[in-house]
Each structure stands twice: as structure tokens, then as C-alpha cells.
Amino acid sequence: MKTYKGYLIDLDGTMYNGTEKIEEACEFVRTLKDRGVPYLFVTNNSSRTPKQVADKLVSFDIPATEEQVFTTSMATAQHIAQQKKDASVYVIGEEGIRQAIEENGLTFGGENADFVVVGIDRSITYEKFAVGCLAIRNGARFISTNGDIAIPTERGLLPGNGSLTSVLTVSTGVQPVFIGKPESIIMEQAMRVLGTDVSETLMVGDNYATDIMAGINAGMDTLLVHTGVTKREHMTDDMEKPTHAIDSLTEWIPYI
């Protein structure tokens, strides 16, 4: 079995299930830490800051620091800064994306911004959509942190960022650049942070459509763990198979 020098790890469904602890995840990450294998938690959640994400992981007894968290907000801000280092950005979104924009030396703009970024915004208003549409029509480049149409909550499935993004797409006729999983952009950014090559990095996740496809799109090896969204019975012959598939992260510990 191939030994990997770095791990990119999904959160919900892989490290925990909502508010429920996954015991095997704790042992898995502790083993990575004890053996000195670098790892980075990669999430499509654009609303939380790295510290907030790390604090939640620690509450589940999973070893994590904010430096070991890579959010779609961070990937989005870095992507924009690479395009134009002093760009102005009109942001629809919450604390996570706004903090990432500031930390990358970008400024906030309005109808004449260089970029429009859409992240999940649970206080969305018509005016926010209106300014975003006007900026795009004025030539702003259109970026979306991720295309998740719905997000699971205790109440059930609620509108995700892809749903918000679609309002601007339909109104302007402009398709955004998506950053988060299953796109390769967030994976490439994360590997730069981790400092490992694509051939020696493993993507670990529970959701075939986002986590595993992100790894496949980035040319990475993938490990599908059936503790969340995608069960064994969901896999069909016409789907590109993950490199590895397991029922519990405990099964992978001997290969770390």
C-alpha cells in the first residue's frame, strides 16, 4: 500500500456528523499527528473562520489548530489576490469570507468593484443581490465560494451557496468561477499550504460528489469513508472509483 506524505481531510461526515462525534476520526487524526504526517482540514464552509473551525474540531477531541484549517473563503481570497493583488471586492457573505478578503490585502467595493464574491449569507437581502448584479454588469469578475445547492441542518436541507449564486447567474447571464469542492482550485491552493506534491497527497472525505470528485479533478489519490453522505450502495459502475474506500477511518490507520 502506498504511503502518503500529506492528507487533505473533509469535516462534516468525515470528522463528525453534525453535532455527533465520530470516535474513529479522533484516533485517525491523532495517529497522523503522532507520526508527524502533515494534514489540513478542507471545508466548503465560507461562513466560519479557521479558528472557529479548529475550535469545533478540538471540542470533538480532534487535534487541530487554525493553521491546519483551509476554508473555501481562504482559497477564494487567495485566488483573487493572484489575479489582482490590490483588487476591490463586493462580498455577499459572512465573517469567514470577509476576514479572508481583508487578510489577503484586498479591499471592499460596491457597484464598481473588480470582483463579486458570493458566499453563504444567512442575512441575504434584495439590495445585496442588486449591488452584486450591477457590479457584474459593470465588468466585475464573478466568483462563488462553492456551488452547494443545499446544506444539511437539524431542520433539514436549507438553501446553500449555490442557490444564492444562481440568482446572480440568472439575472446577469454570467457564469461564476466556483472555488470550493469539487473544483480543483481549492485543492491546488490547499496543497500549496500543506507543502506536498499532488502525487504524495491523499484526499479523505465522505461525499463522493464533492470530496472525492475534488480529489479526482485535481489528479489526487482519494479515500472515500462511508461514515457520511455516500454509502457503498450509492456507488454505481459508471462512477469513477475512488483510489480507496473504507467503512471506518480505523481501517486506514495501519497504512499511515
Swiss-Prot record:
The keyword Hydrolase applies. Catalyzes the hydrolysis of various purine and pyrimidine 5'-nucleotides, showing preference for 5'-nucleoside monophosphates and exhibiting the highest catalytic activity toward 5'-XMP. Also shows a relatively high phosphohydrolase activity toward the nucleotide precursors ribose-5-phosphate (R5P) and 5-phosphoribosyl-1-pyrophosphate (PRPP), and toward the non-natural substrate p-nitrophenyl phosphate (pNPP). Its EC number is 3.1.3.5. Keywords: Cytoplasm, Hydrolase, Magnesium, Metal-binding. Coiled coil: none annotated. Its cofactor is Mg(2+). Disruption phenotype: Inactivation of the gene has essentially no effect on cell growth in rich or minimal medium but results in a drop in pNPP hydrolysis in the crude extracts of B.subtilis cells to undetectable levels. Gene3D superfamilies: HAD superfamily/HAD-like (3.40.50.1000). It is an enzyme of class 3 (hydrolase). GO terms for cellular component: cytoplasm. It is found in: Cytoplasm. PANTHER family: 4-NITROPHENYLPHOSPHATASE-RELATED, HALOACID DEHALOGENASE-LIKE HYDROLASE DOMAIN-CONTAINING PROTEIN 2. It catalyses: a ribonucleoside 5'-phosphate + H2O = a ribonucleoside + phosphate; XMP + H2O = xanthosine + phosphate. Induction: Cotranscribed with the two upstream genes, yutD and yutE. YutF overproduction increases the level of yutDEF operon expression, and this up-regulation is enhanced in the presence of inorganic phosphate. Pfam families: Hydrolase_6 (PF13344), Hydrolase_like (PF13242). GO terms for molecular function: metal ion binding; phosphatase activity; XMP 5'-nucleosidase activity. Belongs to the HAD-like hydrolase superfamily. NagD family. Homodimer. InterPro entries: HAD-like_sf, HAD-SF_hydro_IIA, HAD-SF_hydro_IIA_hyp1, HAD_sf. It comes from Bacillus subtilis (strain 168). It comes from the Bacteria. This is 5'-nucleotidase YutF.
